[in-house]
Every structure is written in C-alpha cells, then in structure tokens.
Amino acid sequence: MCNIIYNNVYQYNILKNIMSFVKEKNTPVMEQYLNLKAQYKDHLLFYRLGDFYELFFDDAIKAAKLLNIVLTKRGNSCGQDIPMCGVPAHSSESYLHKLIDLGFKVAICDQLETADEAKKRGYKSIVKRDVVRVVTPGTIIEDSLLEDKSNNYLASIVEQNDEYAISWLELSTGKFFHTLTSLKALDSDLLRISPRELLISEKFTEDEKIRSVLKNYKISITQHAQSFFEYSKSHRTLCEFYKIRELGSIGNFSKVEIMACGALLEYVRVTQRGSIPRLEFPKTYKQQNFMLIDASARRNLELFSTQFGEKKGSLISVIDHTVTASGGRLLKQMLASPLACSKAINLRLSTAQFFVNNHEPRRKIREILSNIPDIERSLSRLILGRGSPKDMNLLKIGLGKTLELSEFLSTLHNYCLSEKSEINSQMSFQCLTKEKEPVSTTQVISSDESELSTIHKSLGNHKDLFELLNSAILDNNLSSVKEGGFIHSKYNSELSELSYILNNSNKLVTKLRESYRDLTGIAALKILHNNILGYYVEVSANHKITSDIFIHRQSLANSMRYTTNELKELENKILTARDAAIGLEMKIFSELCSEVAKESEKIALAANALAKLDIRTAFAELAVQNNYVKPIIDDSKEFNICSGRHPVVEVNNKFIANSINLAGIHLITGPNMAGKSTFLRQNALIAVLAHMGSFVPAESAHIGVIDKIFSRVGATDNITAGYSTFMVEMIETATIVNQATDRSLVILDEIGRGTGVYDGLSIAQAVIEHIHNVNKCRAIFATHYHELTKVSKYLKNVKCFCVKIREWNGEVIFLHEVIEGIADESYGIHVAKLAGFPDSVLNRASEVFEELKA
C-alpha cells in the first residue's frame, strides 16, 4: 500500500531567517535570487544563469543528493559558503521529472531579457529574471514528463454541509470534469480518476475518515486555506476564465461543485503565472450513465495493474491495441467508467462489428492512425504559450493525416453506397463482405445517427490550416523557437532574403569583390575579414585607389586597407542576419500560434474523434486476434455467457472455457486450485468489456445492463487503516449488501473465513439471504462451506454449482470445469501435497481428517 505524499512534508526554509541574508551585503545576482526565493519558500527554485538552471542553499543540498549531481559553492553570505548545484537548461526536463515524481514543486525562474538589453538599461543593471511558471505533479505539460497513454489529472475535493464535490482537469489535454460525490464513494472516485495531485483545504484533512481514504493513494497533496475554495471567489474565477456572466450558460453546477472547479482554475492561474491554457467547459460526470465499479472490485479485478503493482498481467495490458496516445488515454477512461446505457453501448458495438467484418478498411485506418502524433497535447502547449517548433510540426503532420483519414472515410462511405459490383483495386475493399453479424454496413457508414458518421463529421476540414502550416513549417524536432531554422525561407520574403545572406555570405562578398576589381582595375584586390576591422578591402601598397567610395582604414608596410558604405552594409547584414532571422521566425511562430488558437476547438474535437476511431478499430483488432464475440446488450436482467474465458489468463495458458446462465445467485463449491476465483473474475471482466463496447472472450454473451459491479475476492490486512483481514472482508461485504441494486453484479469469494467456523458460516448464510431477498441482484458466490448449499432448498433463485474434480490413483486432477452440483469435499490435503508438504505432515493430516469425519 502506498503512503500519501503531502507537499508540506517537503516544506523547508531556505534559511533560518531569509531576511537576514537579504539585508546582508550580497552580489546583485544573489540578492535577486534571495528576493525570488522568499516568494517561493516551499518550492525548489530553478534559477536561470546563462545556459544552466542553478539551485542555491538548502535547495542545492537537497537537489544534489536527489539528482546525483555535483554539489559545489558560489561565493559566501554571512560568512558562510553558499551551496550550489546546477543542471543544463537544455536537459532540465529529465531532472524536473525526478523531482516531480518525488512530490516536489519547482518554480522555474527564467531570464526575461538578454545581457545586452540589461546593459542598455544601465551600467550596473543585472538581467531581469522572474518565475514564469510553477511545475507541480498535476500541472505538467511537457511530453518528456508525461506518459503517452496515461492521463495526468489535477483534482480538488470540497465539502460543505456534508455535501461533497470532486473536480478534475488535465492541463495537457484541456479535459475538465466535475461531479457530486459522497464520503462513501470517495475511495472509488479517487481510484477511478487516479489524480497525480489533489487540492484540499487544511480543514478537510482534519477529518480522520478523509485521511484514512487518502492514505490508500500515492497522491501529491496540496493544502490551502479554506478561503482558497470560497464560493464567491470560485464563481468569479469561473466566469472570468470563460468570459461569461452566468455559469448556467456552460452547465449545471451545485454550489459545492463551483467551489471545486473554481479552486482548480485559481491554482492553474497561480502555477502558470498568467499564461492562459485551453480548457474545455467543465463537463458533469453523471454517475447514472456509467457502471459503478467500487474500489474493492477495481483492485480485485486487476483492471490497470496486478495486486503486485505490475501493468503486465492486468486487463488493460491485454486489451490495449490502440495505436495513438490519445486513443490509449481514452481507452483507460472507458475502462475506468464503462457505460450503463444499452443504446450507447450498442452504437459502439456496431462500429466495432463493422471493422471486425471488414479487414482492409480496418488495416488502412490503423495504418493512418499509427502515423498521427499526439496533437491533443501539442495543441495545449501551443495555446499555453509553451509550444515548440516540434509541437507545431507535429500538429502539421497530424492535421495532414487527419485530412487523409477523412478522405478515406468519404471514399469508404461512397463505396458502400454505390451499386457498383466491381472491386476498387486502389482501395482494396475486397473485405467489405456480407456481415457475419446482423449489422448493416451502409447504416454504420452513412446513417446520421451512426457513431462512425459522427466521428467522420467531427474530424472536420482543416485543409486551410494544414496548408498554412505546411507552407510555413519545416520538418523539425526543435524544442525551442530560439534555435531558429524551422520556418520555410520561401514563406516570408524578408526571411528569404536573410536566409540567402546566411547561406551565401561568401558568394555575396565575392560578387562585391569582383565589382570592385572592375571598378578599380586592380585584379589583385581582395576583401578580407578579421575580428578587429571586420570586412575590409585590401590592395598592395603599389596600387592607388582614387574612387571616392573607398574610405581609408589602415596603412601597412606592404598593403593598404579600405572600407566602403556598401561593404559596411553587407557586413552588418551578414552579422545580424542570424539574429534577425531568429527574431523573424519567432514572430512568424507567434502568428501561427494565433491561427492555431482560432481553430483550437475544432482541432480538439478532431483529436477526440481520432481517439474514438482508434479504439473502435483496436476493439476489432482485439476481437479478431483473440477470437472475441459481439455480446448482446439490452435492458433485461440476463447474464448468459456461453463458453466464457478469462481475457488475461487465456493469453499465456491453456484455458478451459465455462458457461453461465445467471438469473439469481450461483453458489459454487470446490477446493482451492480448482479455478473458482478465476471463474468469478472472468465473468466480471466479461461484463466490464461488454459495457465498454468491446467484444468479449466467449462463444456468445447476452448481458442485461449492469449498474454496479461489486467484488469481494481475496483478502489482505489494511495496516495503514488499522484493519485486520477479517475487518477488511466485513467492510467490503457491508458495502455490497448496503449498495447493490437489482441491476448489480456481485462476485463473492469466501465470506467469513477470517473468523470461527460458526461465525463465518452464519455471516455467509445471512449475506446470501439478504442478497436474494433484498438486493435481488445477480451474484456468484464461491465458498468452502458446503453447509451453505442447503439455502438452495428454500431460496428459489439460488443454484448450486461445483468445480469438476477427478481422482486417479490417489491423485486429484483439477479439470477447471464448472458444473451443476455440490462438491463432495474440499481436497485441502491434496492441495497441501501440491504445495510440497512433507509426507509426515500429510499423513498426520489425513489421520486427523478421518477422525473428524467419524
């Protein structure tokens, strides 16, 4: 279990009394540093000095150790050496990554002018510097600090009068959500959202129940005074950010939701130091539209990671066939929040079915998608003013590929509508066959209500912007506009002239030299250069130049040196061309960013459409490769799976498929190692996949919409909360009996084994009766208590099943087949033998077993 990371754990004072050092006679640079540090005492301050970011005092001591870099010193203050360490500015992101992962906040202080500009202000003026942004775990936008296929959410939780709200946004993509919640649901919400950083009030953490929930997560916690979340302030912040008068124009908010959303925006404003990000209007997350998977079920089903914290072996590791970063992120959101609406699910399934049936369009679309960069994050950086030439180039490539994809979908649309029978060899649509499932190709492609049609429209037409960027931006991988060389020289006449000078300076000098030779008649006339005179005309002392255009510069024993106004002008152009070109490119880049900003909403819409298309084709690829089938999803209460398989276990192991027709409660008996837990989990995972809009590992599946999935499988102590294994088991079971509805799916494994036999049996039987009579939900209950099977005699919707076992020559063979009936015994001694128990212990166990049976 991971401990919570509180930022105030890392709070430290730069000096015992920082003001005493400010008053002490210091160098201008150190005085500037100390004044800035006084404003950011709780942050590491990256202070730009030339090509390095330097850290001083306690910052340096701490950073040098954590980053494994050399700790040195720079002068002294108050009679003490000043500790110092530094990192190259060009590679600072890798060091930032380490510090952010450790829970630090880093204030980035940059130079706001050049040394020459500072000199113009005065002889003793130092370069202006200021903090341009604060980097925290939840406000990262740099690609190198982010995982391509993972969201990086900043969240806030607010409570007022026992009403809770949680809001979350991602600065790197512009996504913004909010919802009402409760103390009971907080654990599930945090696990579903998985924020990197959480804003809460200092008062909020005084609640022991809140602290016990937060201890389960490795989240960077940022605490603020209650005034930071104040309602009127938050309301004003939201209205000012979105330039509206009333919040009703962008959505419905409760008072506590406004407080949560407003606090997030205020925190973004503070950390971004005036740069305005592109954020979508806050969307209400309506829980009734999604399947609720409680925190215990999320962990037990190993949706995103195994019990050991590994991604390999989780459900996401098997089903993620996406080829774009945005598709991978959206897939995780879909897995975290499966749908609970049959119409919406079936729209997704129909699109996936089309791509299952039609291989060539699927292949072509995935090929195009695989070459589309992460335009969603590049767009956000460009709008925020932190984009690079690389980002602009990636956006250009992405828009070009989006146009190609849109044209392909148009061709596909026209092809499906045409009456022609011939095969278009160029598009290779020979796989547009008659459907394996009853889904109309024409309807999926052309219907205004179809998901594919909606996706196609959302891609939009970005031809004008693409052509603009394509004419302006060279293919590049540059991380800074200050490097120059990323704008086509032909895009701008002035830049073209500067580029010509930069690339042809020798030719220009030679051309001028030849004209001077013709003018003077001196064939040996030269134009040379040195660091003192710059460019100059040189002739031997024997020659005399009479033309008025030549200005005498220097006389030597064997030569005479001159200059001309024309040569001075050329020299000035050559010397300033690079700086002028870079300045002009920066200006053009800024203009292009403005053009991108005008189209930002359309680009964001296209990026979301690309992600959806990626997932639908990925689901089809998964279905074809792993032999999945399209489930029937409706509003019934069916749960009929024919030859279902565990999607993860089957990948690397020979798997025995099992069927289930669950109308009430299935009570499953059998020994450990027989496959009960796997059977329980596989059915829950099949339900999750189906509600995502994915095909499922089975021969057939008919599932009525499930509103909630609960799981109590396995048990461990929760030491941080002070709970025993049995207490954890009881808490999880209490959640089920209190919250499950008649549309829920419950999987229960071994209730009551953490206490005495009679206690455990009594609790287990009472739970079954409650689920049957009160919750009335679909449930699979695995147990060692054979005595429980008697409930099937008086509870009409309870059926008994067992895992098939074969005994052969004194050995037990687990067949992993679930059949109707009741297990004869638990075969615990046989399992102990498989585990390697000594014969003496096994023999004694057998003796005791026979005595107990007697």
UniProtKB/Swiss-Prot annotation:
Coiled-coil annotated spans: none
Molecular function terms, GO-annotated: ATP binding; ATP-dependent DNA damage sensor activity; damaged DNA binding; mismatched DNA binding
Role this protein plays: This protein is involved in the repair of mismatches in DNA. It is possible that it carries out the mismatch recognition step. This protein has a weak ATPase activity.
Encoding gene per record: mutS
Family to which the UniProt record says this protein belongs: Belongs to the DNA mismatch repair MutS family.
Keyword terms, alphabetized: ATP-binding, DNA damage, DNA repair, DNA-binding, Nucleotide-binding
HAMAP family in UniProt: MutS
Biological processes per GO annotation: mismatch repair
Phylogenetic placement of the source organism: Bacteria, Pseudomonadati, Pseudomonadota, Alphaproteobacteria, Rickettsiales
Keyword ATP-binding among record annotations: yes
Protein name: DNA mismatch repair protein MutS
Keyword Signal part of the UniProt annotation: no
A Pfam family this chain is assigned to: MutS_I
Organism: Wolbachia sp. subsp. Drosophila simulans (strain wRi)
Amino acids binding ATP: G670, P671, N672, M673, A674, G675, K676, S677
InterPro entries in UniProt: DNA_mismatch_repair_MutS, DNA_mismatch_repair_MutS-lik_N, DNA_mismatch_repair_MutS/MSH, DNA_mismatch_repair_MutS_C, DNA_mismatch_repair_MutS_clamp, DNA_mismatch_repair_MutS_core, DNA_mismatch_repair_MutS_N, DNA_mismatch_repair_MutS_sf
